[in-house]
Amino acid sequence: MVETLLEVRNLSKTFRYRTGWFRRQTVDAVKPLSFTLRERQTLAIIGENGSGKSTLAKMLAGMIEPTSGELLIDDHPLHYGDYSFRSQRIRMIFQDPSTSLNPRQRISQILDFPLRLNTDLEPEQRRKQIVETMRMVGLLPDHVSYYPHMLAPGQKQRLGLARALILRPKVIIADEALASLDMSMRSQLINLMLELQEKQGISYIYVTQHIGMMKHISDQVLVMHQGEVVERGSTADVLASPLHELTRRLIAGHFGEALTADAWRKDR
């Protein structure tokens, strides 16, 4: 029996804004939700803009403090601000590597920084791990001396993946990480991520609006709307028999129909 790797219990986020001298407005960006993630499992979180999916991803990665709820990984609680502990277990890939990678640092510096900050590895050990990680994502050892702007778009996203992998995490969160790539590069990165999942035992949480991509990479899916989960289940079941109107609309917008067993096998 595969044990639960990540457990999310009643996690929520409410933003409070000052709208005047004596007035405040609250927005429930993420209403209390719960889910679990197993080893080597991929969970897709889909929804329209403003559904709360990116806010949820940032709470999981420790970038935003939850208003309420609990996070546990391997039965160990995660607390906001525990960056070193969390970053060795949960890492994130961002949508636009051009803005998330420091343009003034060489690739060697970008990958070395998390190792210096979160491990006790000696310089030579860090160098070996950097080279090994670059090879894992299809980059050459010679690329260590490059700056991000010297890489092609697909290579930049491979670097983003390498930065996520450098601490050998158990969970990688990808927030629309492949959305900006063309279909060929996107397919290459998907295949690479699936290969790494099999070899390294990584679990993914993939945040996306691209329901076609979700079909190919995810085992389970959460559908979010206005901060709450309106549908969940195995990807095959949700796509074949959607229950919520939003899910039906998203599927119809991409595939033109719910995915029956025959339609599932078609390459749309």
UniProtKB/Swiss-Prot annotation:
It is a peripheral membrane protein. Induction: Part of the sapA-sapB-sapC-sapD-sapF operon, RNA detected in mid-log phase cells. Residues 6-251 form the ABC transporter domain. The keyword ATP-binding applies. One of its GO terms (cellular component) is plasma membrane. Disruption phenotype: Loss of resistance to protamine. It is found in: Cell inner membrane. This is Peptide transport system ATP-binding protein SapF.
